[in-house]
């Protein structure tokens, strides 16, 4: 197995605490490898026993036991984890205002220490900080604009990766990433494709620098993710990917060699109508109709006979979200796993039960919660939405389409019911069509991504149940250091052929079991600071002192926002109470930043008061409103408050909110009042499908 050489990294980690950690981790990894091989052997034996048996015609030959080779998925996870374990993490998060400063900060990573870097925003930044829990959150001043030319931009990106892999104290002075990897005696684990003309390059550069991967440019026009690539475009893309792998000079043609991961960090179609050939033949017996698509990430990285040579995934989105996806993958240590099963337990559905996988995760000290039966009902789901999900990982079985998902007993929920998240979350979703239009918030998958899912295995079309890896098997693989997205893909059997499950995120992201020793973090003071750094918590204190002196609403708003950025929701909620006491001007200035903390703290009345002060709530604000209050509408007795909720109905599918609000208006003000509300929405709704559902609701209001 190729890894970081002892001389290149162990010698430069001079801190005793990190040396002790590495010694403990070596023992833990050996133990984990033994367990992983045993688990893999058991799965292989179970598969063999399930196959039809032919009676032997001759006496069996003596069995000569050979050492079991390490399966490539476990090799892949161990290689990724070794990089993670050997390079210390600094206990801080750095917030930057723009992409030029982002690249400059990545160039400050070294083999002595790295840290998360986020392009500051008010959704993904505090979400990441709440999960990472750094001792300091630092804000950097801008270093200026990016250079105008693409060549200069590419040079800056490659420089950042080179710096991150230059061995401190070495006489080597690498001028590019390949030379830096060579000087560190390190063999890259994969290839990242990006374009400086596409904003997702922020993920590409971070993943190349963080994992130690080759960065290759993939320019040219591509249609958006919801579209379908034609066969000619796909053949060209497939050839480009393989040519780039070949150009590295590393072995790539089989899983388990050097290059096993391909991450495409740019916007492109997620579906493809593949050419008719053995290279992209669908699973036997599936018989797709002409024009029906498969997943681009499942079709890529295959030899002419259809054999897979790497696991491909994609990352798309703006610069902020793409950086967040990369940093979540590189630095977070998921601990809590929710396993939610809406399926019945007999027949083929029983294979997708989660109890066995949950038991495996608990053995590895994951905080595991299983939901099934009435706990997986629509009512239970809507109750769980209040305040946002706290899970780090969600394994979920459901049925439906791109615009709805069925809970227990086939009660429908909708994209509007996709949970807000307290922490970044990885998702394995068994559900047809969830990612057919992944950039649209009006689909199940699109809403999950918008809300902060950073790793996602899901389907782009109707894949059939057997196309999904059962959650218990995913859990067993993940617990044995198989990367999360790799664990979500079949690597043998009929559904290892080109089909309809796609992967979004970092294919090298592993989830080390909590039973392993935690990696100690370096103090922020252990490395030199950059120019223009300020401590966000200290900024909040200074703004609060200024606010008490001047009474300026803007100072209160600055203090509250900075508290949110440090992940301190409880303190932010307290400051909101102070803002309200200071009068309307201060409350109005603070309200937009207060919504998130009040939602997550489940302070329903305070949230409602803040929401009503915001002239133009965002779509995410609306999601928080309805997720916090849907199950509390029955407690409202004031007709005026219910009428106000009638004005807040989300416009794409009005029947979703109306179906939950109208019965409460009927309860308080009578059937006619409820019908007036629903009729008013029918009159101002133009979408035919939405109007159909409103009419159905109106017919039921008798």
Regions found by a protein language model. Give the residues of each.
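N-terminal secretory signal peptides that target proteins for export/translocation
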Residues: 1-26
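Bacterial N-terminal signal peptides
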Residues: 28-42
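Signal peptide processing junction and immediate N-terminal pro/mature segment
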Residues: 40-54
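N-terminal low-complexity, Pro/Thr/Ser-rich intrinsically disordered segments
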Residues: 52-91, 160-174
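A structural feature that tracks compact, well-ordered secondary-structure segments
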Residues: 93-113, 120, 191-211
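Cysteine-dependent hydrolase recognition
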Residues: 125-136, 145-585, 596, 600-601, ...
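Generic helix N-cap/helix-start motif at coil->alpha-helix transitions
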Residues: 549-557, 569, 583-592, 602-608, ...
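Inward-facing hydrophobic residues that define packing positions of alpha-helical scaffold repeats
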Residues: 576-577, 610-611, 645-646, 678
